[in-house]
Amino acid sequence: MHVLPDLAYLEEKYPDSLTVIGVHSAKFSNEGDSDQIRKAVERYAIRHPVINDREFEIWNAYGAHAWPTFALIDPEGYLVGMTSGEGKRAVLDQAIDSLVTHHRSNGTLSLSSFPPPPSPENPSLLRFPGKIDIAGNKVLVSDSGHHRLVLLEWDEKTPEKAALADIIGRGEPGNTDGSFDEAQFRDPQGIRFFPGDPDAAIVADTGNHILRRLDFQKRTVTTIGGTGVQGWAIFEPVPALSAVLNSPWDVVFHGDGMLYVALAGSHQIIRYDPVRQEISPVAGSAREDLVDGSGNQASLAQPSGLTSDGTRIYFADSETSSVRLLHPGDTPRQSRVETLVGKGLFEFGNRDGSFHEARLQHPLGVLWDDDVLLVADTYNHRIRALDPATREVLSLTEGNVLDEPSDIKKADKAYLIANTNGHEIAFFLATPKGPVLGTVDILPGNRRDPLHAKDG
């Protein structure tokens, strides 16, 4: 995902001399499903063809060893170079420019372009919603695929319906502060209302690598952290607006009054001090792995979901298919990370049982709920319960009713789920007759959706 902007840049710079072909050699079994690949192509607006290399035939033929790997082939069909890892835009740009110049002078470059496939129609209000939060009758949704946020009015007594109350953002990718109507986001994910103040919220604007503050009274968006430039890692305290963040994916307010942020791109958890307006590291060595221990030595792998019990922070560590626990200290050295469920980067599955035996697959959301952890087990399309007292994992939903759920939040008794690939918010109720799962129907309310103005 992090290299897609680089590829888009190169495709735009060399429109008639560069053809990009994506080869998807899936790590997770869910990612090897062609339907899920099509949804990912749609979600990230990928405009080049993508091959499902499920059996790793192309991967092995090119001798790839890491994700992502780039192979550069010249107009005569020769492999002229390979490199792997993120942050390779400049290297690739220089190599492509050199090849274009050489083959144009030799007359061996055929200038042509391939029109991208048409984007599929999506008539629903939401497009790949990533995260949600609840404050009273207010529900805030990251409408990630539309690069905006949606505010709903919802009553859990009638969980099957909600009303559209407001829209935050123009619905076009960008990085602009200002009024709700003028602001622009880029693939926003984690969102939280301020504790005790439903008129303010924090947004992890993932694609812009920044943190934003929403004021629902003034209807304004303000950047409070990050520069808008993708960074590498945070190892020292830094003024919030000078911090270079790397894909902030979720946020949570903790009992110490601080905002904790999961940086999926740098495999870290950091802390935002709203009083000092400072960002500081808490846990994560910036090496992608599953290693427990002190915060400065522990290794995380794309932490993507956060929840707090007031004392500790639990997080979904997506690339290790694990749920882990953070004891935050004043410094990374004083913090501690331990793993509850999960074994490593290449250990995943779909299995209930003890913490030791259970397997998840790329979970993105967690919720602390009455001494139990609820997990959006994204690639298994399930909601699971982890009980720290019994150290057991239990599936609460079957695997054929949700489509890559990415978050779960609770009102009083009812739960809301960001059913990402279903382009919807689902509700979940535990009743004496068994669990009830349904879809929230979003009615126009006080606002109309400008992206679907003809609807309703």
Regions found by a protein language model. Name each.
Residues 109-130, 156-189, 220-249, 278-302, ...:
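Gly/Pro-rich loop segments of beta-rich domains
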